[in-house]
């Protein structure tokens, strides 16, 4: 839930390991 992945996922995909898409940004925990 913390937006620390430094990645956006406007297309719905995160490439950073351990991160999930909480549109429009990737989050971890």
UniProtKB/Swiss-Prot annotation:
Covalent cross-link site, Cyclopeptide (Gly-Asn): 1-29
One Pfam family this sequence matches: Cyclotide
PTM entry text: This is a cyclic peptide.
The organism's place on the tree of life at top rank: Eukaryota
InterPro entries: Cyclotide, Cyclotide_moebius_CS, Cyclotide_sf
Disulfide cysteine pairs (residue numbers): 5-19, 9-21, 14-26
UniProt KW keywords: Disulfide bond, Plant defense
This protein's record includes keyword Disulfide bond: yes
Keyword ATP-binding: no
A single GO BP: defense response
Function (record text): Probably participates in a plant defense mechanism.
Family the entry assigns: Belongs to the cyclotide family. Moebius subfamily.
This protein's domain notes: The presence of a 'disulfide through disulfide knot' structurally defines this protein as a knottin.
Protein name: Cyclotide vinc-A
Organism: Viola inconspicua
